[in-house]
Swiss-Prot record:
Pfam families: Intron_maturas2, RVT_1. No similarities to sequences of bacterial dehydrogenase or oxidase are found. Moreover, the reverse transcriptase catalytic domain analysis revealed three possible magnesium binding sites in the nicA sequence. In addition, NicA has no significant homology with other genes for degradation of heterocyclic compounds. Therefore, the sequence of NicA seems to be unique among the sequences of bacterial nicotine catabolic genes and more closely related to sequences of higher organisms. The gene is nicA1. Mg(2+) binds at D161, D314, D315. It is hypothesized that the pyrrolidine ring of nicotine is oxidized by NicA to form N-methylmyosmine. The spontaneous ring opening of N-methylmyosmine due to the addition of water generates pseudooxynicotine, which is further oxidized to 3-succinoylpyridine (SP) by NicA through two hypothesized unstable compounds and the removal of methylamine. This is Putative nicotine oxidoreductase. Induction: Expression in nicotine culture is about 5 times as in glycerol culture. Its cofactor is FMN. Disruption phenotype: Deletion of the gene does not affect nicotine catabolism. One of its GO terms (biological process) is mRNA processing. In the N-terminal section; belongs to the bacterial reverse transcriptase family. The lineage of its organism: Bacteria, Pseudomonadati, Pseudomonadota, Gammaproteobacteria, Pseudomonadales. SUPFAM superfamilies: DNA/RNA polymerases. It comes from the Bacteria. Keywords: Magnesium, Metal-binding, NAD, Oxidoreductase.
Length: 618
């Protein structure tokens, strides 16, 4: 255990040293010899969805053992370890296109997790606070929270999208970026091997010359390392264009004059008719167009300017409190910078939106800065509250209702107009499973959009899914929606009983009781920042050193894995029933017992027959 602590202490020392962005790391390849880093890596990924999906070689994490780790380390020592080609599958996207996903062999995944933990120790301390994708303690919600809290006053929003970002990252440019902080060619070459591993698609092998493989464990952090240069570039632009101070900000007289002119023209048009009215409204629209291209404020040096920036993976937005010309200039500068890095702005997705009159989109959320109408707010002066008319320049966020309904339609919950439908693919499930499945879809949507303004907009989505669940139950039982609600209530409560008829559990559709808007209701979890303690915990709980829990033999012990311990609509049979009773997806077994499990010879065994039942249950 002391050796384990030394391994993790070294990683923690690397993390602390790299709080200095100029620090250069050397002799880190030797960490790839540390058995305990592989054990912690295995423990971290062993139960994640997809890790029982076979790679191209047909292997899974089943039969993973200490011997597997030691074989990897021996290959690391003579530098003969190679990453095998991943199996590529195409995943459908909402727009009808597909995105590639790579399924790597299990040993490759464990090695990648070790590499990822080392790269995280090197780069995480100095990653930008504006970068939120694939980082501990960061998420879509932290990115949107940053916009909510710091984007007041923004007049223009640049929606940024990098065309095929993950697929087009230059390997040579990425390696050059890594070499700025890593002076260890053996470690660099190991990463190069991972990048060059290629993939199999429909049985044919394709070499990889560009991009980080999607679905790879190290792909997200490598993308963040590469895009960190974009973060630094934009942050320099933020400093370069920082102009004026808050106390210097005054309203531009020309802006106020044009504003009064627009208001006067609209009032005049209300009293007119026909062609005369149309001509006046045309002048009002012309005045409004000029207003949209102007900043409302001046400073002593004739211009108050602020630039904001947030990035999540390859999605980013820039906010400009200043003229549209500056927004256009920034888009051009960023596009040129990305081109020099070997990437390309997606022209069809990179828009400049007026923050008040147009809607920008970021991370599935519609974004505007305030509204066009002024409102009365209470301000505090000398301890007393006074009413003040303000223009409303704070960020406002909404759910994209039309897109959500279209997505629900594509998944069979409603028709194109949002009318609930029977979910035919689930009518063969148990009643509680139908309510749980459809309820989980609704729970995911309401949790993601918990922070939006006008939260009650989501009542439409709740209605669709609540009634889709009721219609599915009605179809299954050849009944009607009204009878289902009469029997189970509005929340579709289903009671689950044991063989004696006793209620052991009940399931309900998660209905919202209060539609009160809470703009600060972001779902942000706590972060376990103690790497040493967390890693030792993973290492300590590992059963990779344990004997066989069935017969207590120490001969060729490996982990027996199952893909699921519970799966809706399927009866649990055979040896899997033991794992269900243990609530475990992996147990250590010797080679002989492992063969018997797969041959079905232990299908009738129970936990009391195990030589080490407590180890199995731990």
């Amino acid at each position: 255990m002391r050796d384990a602590e030394q391994s993790f202490t070294r990683i923690e020392a690397i993390r602390k040293a790299n709080s200095d962005p100029s620090y250069v790391n050397d002799r880190i390849y030797r960490l790839m010899y540390k058995e305990d880093l592989y054990i912690a890596a295995y423990e971290k990924i062993k139960s994640k969805p997809g890790n029982m999906t076979p790679g191209q070689d047909g292997t899974t994490l089943d039969e993973f053992s200490i011997r597997t780790i030691r074989n990897i380390i021996n290959k690391m020592k003579d530098e003969s370890f190679t990453f095998r080609g991943a199996r590529r599958v195409l995943i459908p996207k909402a727009n009808g296109k597909t995105r590639p996903l790579s399924v790597a062999p299990p040993t490759d995944k464990v090695v990648q997790e070790v590499i990822r933990s080392i790269l995280e120790a090197i780069y995480e301390p100095t990653f930008s606070k504006n970068s939120h994708g694939f980082r501990a303690g960061k998420s879509c919600h932290t990115a949107l929270k940053q916009v909510r809290e710091s984007w007041s006053g923004v007049t223009w929003v640049i929606e940024g999208d990098i065309k095929g970002c993950f697929d087009n990252i230059s390997h040579s440019k990425l390696i050059d970026q890594l070499r700025l902080r890593i002076k260890d060619e053996r470690f660099i070459n190991l990463i190069r091997k991972a990048l060059n591993a290629g993939y199999f698609e429909n049985g044919a092998f394709f070499s990889a010359t560009l991009g980080t493989p999607q679905g790879s464990i190290i792909s997200p952090i490598l993308a963040n390392v590469f895009l960190d240069q974009l973060d630094r570039k934009v942050e320099q632009l933020i400093k370069d264009h920082h102009q004026g101070e808050e106390g210097d900000k005054i309203t531009d007289p020309a802006y106020r004059k044009l504003q009064r002119q627009k208001t006067s023209l609209r009032k005049k048009a209300e009293k007119q008719e026909g062609a005369e009215r149309d001509a006046t409204l045309s002048l009002a629209r012309e005045a409004n167009s000029k207003l949209l291209s102007m900043s409302p404020y001046l400073t002593r040096n004739n211009g108050f300017i602020r630039v904001k920036y947030v990035r999540y993976a390859d999605d980013w937005i820039i906010g400009v409190n200043g003229p549209k010309l500056l927004a256009e200039e920034l888009r051009s500068v960023v596009g040129e910078f990305l081109e020099n890095a070997g990437l390309e702005l997606s022209i069809e997705k990179t828009h400049i939106r007026h923050a008040k009159s147009e809607t920008a989109k970021f991370l599935g959320t519609n974004l505007r800065i305030g509204s066009e109408n002024s409102k009365i707010m209470k301000v505090l002066r000398n301890g007393k509250k006074f009413p003040k008319r303000v223009a409303g320049w704070t960020p406002v966020m909404y759910a994209p209702m039309n897109e959500l309904i279209a997505k629900l339609h594509s998944r069979g919950f409603c028709d194109p107009k949002g009318n609930p439908t029977t979910v035919n693919k689930w009518i063969f499930l148990d009643d509680n499973q139908i309510v749980e499945q459809i309820g989980s879809v609704w729970r995911g949507i309401m949790n993601y959009y918990s922070f939006i303004d006008q939260f009650s907009m989501l009542s439409r989505i709740q209605f669709i899914l609540q009634h889709a669940a009721a219609k599915t139950l009605a179809t299954k039982h050849r009944s009607s929606r009204s009878k289902i609600f009469s029997k189970h209530g509005a929340n579709l409560r289903v009671r689950i009983r044991d063989k004696a008829g006793n209620v052991i559990r009940q399931v309900e559709f998660p209905l919202i009781k209060s539609w009160k808007t809470s703009p600060k209701r972001f779902k942000i979890g706590t972060v376990d920042t103690n790497f040493l303690e967390r890693s030792l915990r993973l290492r300590t709980r590992s059963k990779l050193y344990s004997p066989c829990v069935i017969c207590e033999s120490g001969d060729r012990v490996a982990m027996h894995h199952v893909r699921h311990i519970r799966k809706m609509g399927q009866e649990i049979k055979g040896f899997k029933r033991v794992l269900v009773s243990l609530n475990r997806k992996q147990i250590p077994v010797c080679h002989e017992c492992h063969l018997k499990i797969h041959q079905g010879k232990y299908d009738g065994i129970s936990l009391k027959d195990f030589a080490l039942p407590h180890t199995a249950a731990a």
